[in-house]
Amino acid sequence: LSCASCENAACPAIGLPCKPSEYVYTPCGCCPQCPLELGQPCGSFTQRCQFDLWCLRRKGNKIEAYKYVPWHLDFKGVCARVDV
């Protein structure tokens, strides 16, 4: 992943209505977006899930969950609640 300067970023319109205090940012950190909701697909190159959710996937008998999915992983999951 190579990030250009945010000065020239063409940010997409913010999707679902959310408060500015809830904004999360695209992987390069330039564009504010609303966080993903329960059940929405998430991964390395999406915005984060809502603050009380994790990006989760099942892999065989194992469950992997990330609060902040590292950009360098090939990770695709679904926003879900996780009891730790």
Swiss-Prot record:
The keyword Heme does not apply. It comes from Haliotis laevigata. This is Perlustrin. The keyword Disulfide bond applies. PROSITE patterns: IGFBP_N_1 (PS00222), IGFBP_N_2 (PS51323). GO terms for cellular component: extracellular region. Keywords: Disulfide bond, Growth factor binding. It comes from the Eukaryota. Shell. Residues 1-82 form the IGFBP N-terminal domain. Disulfide bonds join 3-28, 6-30, 11-31, 18-34, 42-55, 49-79. Binds human IGF1 and IGF2 and bovine insulin. Pfam families: IGFBP. One of its GO terms (molecular function) is growth factor binding.
